[in-house]
Amino acid sequence: MGDTNGQVVAGGNGYGSRLDRPTDVLIDKETDSLIICDWNNRRVVRWSRRSDTTQGEILINNIKCSRLAMDDQRYLYISDIEKHEVKRYQIGDKNGTLVAGGNGQGASLNQLNFPTYIFVDQQQTIYVSDRDNHRVMKWNKGAKEGIVVAG
């Protein structure tokens, strides 16, 4: 059956290692790599699963990343808890496109307050758990404000 010992595949064993408070991870099947929200280092990194990689490639810097998702076209969606927004990135793009929030911290339909978990469907509709507003928001592709779907 299963192995009783885990294996470190990214970062190290404790505080001060290469990753500092990773908050989310997904697998990019096309590149066979892990994409990680490295929260306390304020970045998103990619680690190959194919080799004994000793450090990750920085995809996006200067972001207080909480969670991430990837759609069918391999766009990366990242919730930024400091800017209270969600952006969509093409791999290699450093700036991204605003897709939810982005109007400062608040409770209006065009604002978020500590966006955490995100889900993107096949129509690129984004669902955001808007933690400190105690709601889940739906943002249709191209929308300037969201719709409360729960809370």
Task: Outline where the language-model segments fall.
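Short loop/turn segments immediately following the C-termini of beta-strands
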Residues: M1, W39, I81, I91, ...
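Hydrophobic/aromatic beta-strand positions that recur at structurally equivalent sites within the blades
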Residues: M1-G2, I27, V44-S48, Y89, ...
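Gly/Pro-rich loop segments of beta-rich domains
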Residues: G2-T23, R50-K64, G92-T116, G142-G151
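Conserved positions at the start
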Residues: P22, C65-R67, Q73, K83, ...
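Residue-level detector of Asp-centered blade-edge/turn motifs that repeat once per structural unit
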Residues: I27-T31, M70-Q73, V120-Q123
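Conserved beta-propeller blade signature
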Residues: S33-I35, Y75-I78, T125-Y127
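Structural signal for beta-propeller blades
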Residues: R42-V45, H84-V86, H134-V136
